[in-house]
Each structure stands twice: as C-alpha cells, then as structure tokens.
Amino acid sequence: VPVIAGITGEGTEVAALEAQRAVEAGASAGLLYPSHGWLRFGYQKGAPQDRYRVVYEESGLPLILFQYPDVTKATYNLETMLDISAQPGVFAMKNGVRNMRRWDTEIPVIRRERPDLQILSCHDEYLLHTAFDIDGFLVGYGNIAPELLLELLEAGKAQDYVKAKAVHDRLLPVTKAVYHRGSHMEGTVALKH
C-alpha cells in the first residue's frame, strides 16, 4: 500500500528535512502543506514555488500540491498552482479551495495546461460537485465510506450524473452529520467519534 506522508513542517528547510525522513521511512509521496504562518499572514510572491522546489530537490520525494481553502491566506492563485504543478517532482494536486466559482474556473485551465497532473478533491462536503473533474479523492471521508466513495468516483469519471447523485444521496446524512458544521474543526472532531 503506498504511503502518502503529510509534510507539515514550518519553514522550507524544516519541511525538506521532514520529507527526507518520510523517504527514509518508506513513503511513496508527500502531501506538502503550506507553512502554517501563511494561514494568518500570507506569503511572499514565489515562496510557495520555492518551498516545493527545495523540498523535492533535497528529498527526492514526489509531491502533491495542496490547495488550501480560499478563505485562508495560504490559498494559491491560478498562476501559482500552474507554476508549482510544472515543477519536477510534483505529480498531483489535492484541491480544497472550497469555492466552487474558483473550482469551475480554475480546474479546466489546470486540466488544459497540465494534462498529466492528477487532480484529487478534498471537498468532503462537495463530493458531488467535484466528482466529475477529478482523478481521485484524498479525503477524510475515506475512513467512513470508502466503498461509496469509489462508486461516486467511478460515476464521476463516467460522467454518469444519475448514478453519482444516487450515491451522493446515500452519503448525504453522513455528510450533514460530519461536514455540514460551523467549522472544519467541528467536522474533524465528529469524524473521530
């Protein structure tokens, strides 16, 4: 089973060391989180691109671009996502922008410009909307209903809205109980209990 390590270290050099340890432990890939300081303060132009470049160059760990919600200051604009996804070692994107206007605008451009990039949705609360544009899900929901997620993914890839909607409707009570809450952290707690 491939292991995707979450690379969460604050600062680029610390993240590169964390990625090196992940390689030594047998990880197949790394999901590179933005520096947590960016959530509150934002980042300088070019800093995200530099983070991915340095972490890959120093570790050799294949990386997944992690697009944070656009309500944070750690979200990347389209240009930044295209820059990062063109870098050596970046093979996929976990997109959690949580703004369907941006999703509907940016995902087609990313598909056109980076056709080999795997696009993974992490929109647990927007599974139906994103299922038609992706290569897979990288979601906490996979711990709850993996079989139904696979059915939804297959329906989305087949562009079968009727089947996808039927799976979505089966998942909706769980989605509401876990993900339709006041904050993401409330959903995280609900997911664990």
List where the protein language model places each region.
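Active-site beta->alpha loop and helix N-cap motifs at the rims of alpha/beta catalytic domains
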Residues: 1-73
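Short glycine-/small-residue-rich flexible loop motifs, especially phosphate/cofactor-binding loops
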Residues: 19, 126, 192
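Catalytic alpha/beta core domains of metabolic enzymes, predominantly
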Residues: 54-58, 69-183
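Active-site pocket-lining/capping segments in soluble small-molecule metabolic enzymes
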Residues: 181-193
